[in-house]
Structure formats: structure tokens, C-alpha cells
Amino acid sequence: MIKKSTLALAAAVAYHSAPGFAAGTSGSGTITFSATVIEGPCSISAADSNMTIDLGQVSQRMLNGPGKFSDSVPVVIHLTGCSFDEDTGTTPNPNGKLSKVAVQFLGTFTNTQLGKISSTGTATAVAVQLLESDGTTPVNLAATPSAANAKQLINGSNELRYWARMSVVGGPGAVTSGTGSVQANATYALAYF
């Protein structure tokens, strides 16, 4: 009789302690949420706040020679929730106040006129070239944002489209590059007009 009571008690204890034991060994973690509240009339998509653009693994032969580049890869900044106040100025913008945006890129550049961003990787004489939305015109990295070079936005969602590719450092006469990694960084800042 004592054996049956002990067995029943042991089974009851095991049954009631199993969920606690299982929950303790299931794992846990921390979730950190971050965001920034900005003044601009548009929000920047969370996926575009800190982008990583993969330009691929490119043969050195593809880059060696004047005017040679890697294939271009799209770089898109998504603006969401754009909403503009009515423009009541002397020459009002029918789309509203601050409904134009210009992008300024900040960083270390090897050639601002040709849109070339310096690489800190191990590949020698290679830069990342940033192109306008047409895919051929280099972004002038020295340009100051102004209404003249700003893009007209609409209410709702908008895309700011650019292209990136690898290029040899220097101008059209630069012809050689070395193998290795390419790492380039630029920060973008939006200016509304």
C-alpha cells in the first residue's frame, strides 16, 4: 500500500512540475524595438533605414579597362505615408508645401563628379559608383541639395531610385583593379523643398 501511495505521489509531482521544467528549458530572448520620429512629410521605410546592397562577385577582368564596370544593381529608398500641406505662396506648388525632395549622399569619395564612393575593402583601385535613376548618369556627390535638383513627390508612397556598380578608382583613363573585398559606406540625407 505504501508503494502505491508513493508511486501515485511521485507521478503527481512529476506531472505538475513537467510544464515548469519544460518552459524553463525552451529558451528565451530579448526583442529590442527602435525607431526615430522625424519632421519630414514622408516616412522612410524601415527596410531602407540601413541598407546593404550586394554588388556580387565580379571578375577582375570585367573591371579592368577604361569605361568598364560591374553590372548595375538597384538602390531604392522607399518613402511612405507622404502628406503635404497646401502651398499658399506666390507661386504655389499644386502638390503642396515641401512636396519635392533632394537626396544628399555623405561619406568618403574618390571622385565626387563621377559618383565614386571610396572602398575600405582589400580590393585595390576599386570604388562603388552611384548612378542616377537613368542608370547611366553619375550622381554628383558634391552637389548641394536644392529645389532645382529635387524630385516631385505625390501623396502616399514614392520611390527614390538609384543604381550602384563597381568601377575602377579615378576617371575614364583608369584601367586596373586588384582582387579582394569591396566595402563602401555612404549616408543619405533628405532635404524637402
Task: Report each predicted region and the residues it spans.
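Mature extracellular/passenger domains of Gram-negative fimbrial/pilin and adhesin proteins
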Residues: 2-6, 15-16, 20-193
